Amino acid sequence: MNTNRRSFLKLGGAALGASTLPFLKMLPAQAAGEDVIVAVMGQTINSLDLHRTGTNRPSYQVAVNVYDRLVSFGTKTAEDGNLSYDYSVIEPEIAESWEETKEALIFKLKPSGKFHDGTPITAADVKWSFDRALALGGFPAVQMKAGSLEDPKQFEVIDDLTFKINLIRPSKLTLPDLAVPIPMVINSKVALANATTEDPWATEYLHKTPAGSGAFMVERWDPGQQLVYTRNENYTSGPVPAVKRVIVREVPSPATRRALLERGDVNLSFNMPNKDAKELAGIDGLNIQTTPIENSIYSLCPNLAFEPFQDKRVRQAIAWSVPYQ
């Protein structure tokens, strides 16, 4: 049985791909007492700060659920009935509207925008956050540069609610690049209050203590064990989520995750092995969901030192058998 955004989680349990985690704010409260969703995954969240050097992919969910961006991608129901991003649609998030010219992007922020602590979101917060992504280097800087966002001098505060990006070159990727997780907007007042001379960008503080405006807040984080989200009751970038609390537990063993799901001890299990997914697909009360994997490159790299991969025809046959579409 396929589900759409509104009927998602009507069944007792679901096995999904990890990319569903960013959709937490869209889940209806129909599991675990209608208030709490319990999920298990095999991966480990190693930081709550996506800009921090070494932050891994499982941690991206924190940036999406706890922080907002100027804009976001739309969503759509895929042909198989599952929820997916719609990369052809750019929607406002912190921004209320924007204007595009050949020289610049000018954003008007929502006057109602608030961080989790009630502090108003300003253009100064956006600039500080963008400056930080570039200054810390590594992947955040690479991602920003993919949209020709390369120099802090490009980012200009016009007034509290007006933020301008001066374009160094025309690029069709600039606006979409603002909707990916990296250009998250941080509460600069909180961050600066916890910065030091040795750590001017508050990486140690934000590593464990997010300062965002997203649909969820981090209630607690026990590294290697669990992450607990709680709903932002005063969310200003969209509707307040239906689900009040989400507990994401780290369970390395696929067999254990499967057992927890089958017993009804959890509502969601992520990264289900193909074998388990096939075996569970026909069980009443369980729903296997798939989602496209975003922002990733998968490669098949045979070891050419061994047969049969030294044979060009074998390599061609493998290439032709891959369903690229």
Per-range role (PLM):
Residues 40-101, 131, 211-213:
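N-terminal lobe/hinge region of extracytoplasmic solute-binding protein
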Residues 74-77, 84-85, 89, 181-241, ...:
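Gly/Pro-rich hinge or "lid" segments in bacterial periplasmic/extracellular proteins
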Residues 7-27:
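N-terminal export signals
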Residues 204, 233-279, 308, 320:
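Ligand-site clamp/hinge motif
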Residues 122-129, 160-166, 214-215, 243-245, ...:
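Alpha-helical secondary-structure segments
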Residues 94-139, 158, 164-166, 257-260, ...:
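Aromatic- and charge-enriched surface segment that lines or borders ligand/interaction sites
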Residues 23-42:
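C-terminal segment of N-terminal export signals and the immediately downstream linker at the start
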Residues 99, 143-195:
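Surface-exposed binding/hinge segments that line
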